[in-house]
Amino acid sequence: SSSFGIFAGSDFDIEEAMRVALGEVKSIDFGALKEIAGMNPILAKRFYHETGSMFWLEIDLCPLEKVKEISSSYTSQPGVVGQLLLTIPTNGETEEQNRKLCQEATAASKGFEIITGFAPRSWEIVNLSKEVIALEKIRNENPELAGDPVARKEVQARLAEAHGLLEAEVMRLMDGTIWHRANEAPKRYRQNELNLLASTIADKHFCKTPVVLNELINRVRPSSNANAAQNALLRRMLSHENSERLGIEGFPAEAGLYESVLKLSGLHKKSGKEFVIAKPSKSDPCRFLPLWDAAEELLRSDEKLFSMSDVFKLWQSPPYGVKNGILQLLGTAFVLTMRENLAIYREEVFQTRLTDLEIELLTINPSKIQIRWMNL
């Protein structure tokens, strides 16, 4: 027997909307393209496993015509050891022009490494990007889609497919890219080779990074629980210096920090009949001694007051690269181990000793705590 049914339909002309939207996409926003393509940084994995500190290479896309400008003006962010710049020819440049500009851009980079690259058929990414942008325009700028679930579903499906194709194309380009490094022959890198490259560059720029194998605290932004544990440990460094394990009983959160930083490094150790907080030695497995030496050299360079933020800035810069999360712990240990040669100030007012108030300010605003070297 025959029957009738009701099926959902749509009056929205997606093909016409795509034609109009593509016509309105005149250029590519390369910043947006990086986000659309889901490009993740290249992690320095070996360096991380050896030191506990995470560094990485940024990946960015740029038009070939601007690669020299971008390379020469690049400024690094915390944790970044360099940048991979994948160039896209937007003005019909030849492969030879691409190669020449990439080499010149690499030579023009200053400080941290800029590694430039190009891949055959990289213009395909431009077409896919325009399609993604056009579909997003259709989705966001056509209010009639709100009342048309069939068309809305079709647009969303096409957008998801376009995103997938774009991400796949970026991965294909990365695999086929010829990369240019200063003073080296151009070459292709597989994914694992890029990770090794990131570690090699991290070795070069951060050769004196301390070894802190505690991922809760050795990071740019520790969790609130990690910060609370560190604060508890800092207070115990003041009140229980001469006690074993700083008087910590059991295994609360601060005990893990104590074991992995203070005890392992020898910053807190037994001397005679009691425990003391002592300057790190050359045999310290955490490699803290270069930090102490650098801070002492800074303080000895001038008789003025130096804020703890000056010391922290030094420790964060190459070749040390100390992460924000562990600065307060190391800063407190430095002041305590060098107290016989340091005058301590809070907001430029002399203090006879380090107290909980200075520790709190050291955590909140280290610029308010100052120190001066005294030749006794």
Indicate residue ranges for each PLM-predicted region:
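Extended alpha-helical scaffold and adjacent linker segments that couple domains
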Residues: S1-L376
